[in-house]
Amino acid sequence: MARKSFGQHFLLDLNVTRKIARLAQVGEGDTVVEVGPGPGGLTRALLETGARVVAIEKDSRFLPLLAEVAEVAEGRLELVEGDALKVDAAQAAGGPAHVVSNLPYNVGTQLLINWLTGPFRPLSMTLMFQKEVADRIVAQPGDDAYGRLAVIAQTLCEARTVMDLPAKAFTPPPKVASAVVRLVPKAEPPPAEVVAALERVTAAAFGQRRKMLRSSLKALGGADLCERAGVSPDARAEVIDLAGFLDLARATLGGADQ
């Protein structure tokens, strides 16, 4: 039933889906956007909390089954047929919303980046990823998994792994383990122009992660940029913490006090 081309692996164990719903900390009066509900295992658990669910599903095979769930959900389940990368999630939600999803493996990272930096800013995100991707989101400086995704995600959100799942929890079982990451946006994130600069800096720095910053950031100012930011030009990207990257981003804009 699952389509490999869609990266589909379904969670059908109600004990697992209920735990994810609890970890999401949603309930009556909340709106939840769910991407890729499939046969509705997690959807049912979210509805049990009393939340309103907006489910975005690309695979039309599941719409009749989800429509049956909607019939007994007393108006709290809305179905949107479409590709989550193209659907206007803010419009679909109709207001502030949380995102809770077992994300399709092939688009999970791109969806997260869209939600972190795009016009739709969720109140919180409780997301299932491949374990490798989850590790990249919560990695710390010096970790093998530390990179651009960790810097951007942790600059904008508090991020932590809240649950690990073995492959056997899914139907069909994937070849890798999975994990649930919870991300809560920070109350005072950096201004948009600083975040845009941070994206440029991290793209350059981690694009050549084994090189010293004086080389990897050469197009942005190299050693001079590092000195203005108070960061060692002889350091490599993998050891620079969030504050260091923010200083580098601000320095590209002409200051470190934005």
Curated annotation (Swiss-Prot):
CDD domains: AdoMet_MTases. It is found in: Cytoplasm. It catalyses: adenosine(1518)/adenosine(1519) in 16S rRNA + 4 S-adenosyl-L-methionine = N(6)-dimethyladenosine(1518)/N(6)-dimethyladenosine(1519) in 16S rRNA + 4 S-adenosyl-L-homocysteine + 4 H(+). S-adenosyl-L-methionine binds at residues 9, 11, 36, 57, 83, 102. GO terms for cellular component: cytosol. Specifically dimethylates two adjacent adenosines (A1518 and A1519) in the loop of a conserved hairpin near the 3'-end of 16S rRNA in the 30S particle. May play a critical role in biogenesis of 30S subunits. Belongs to the class I-like SAM-binding methyltransferase superfamily. rRNA adenine N(6)-methyltransferase family. RsmA subfamily. This is Ribosomal RNA small subunit methyltransferase A. The gene is rsmA.
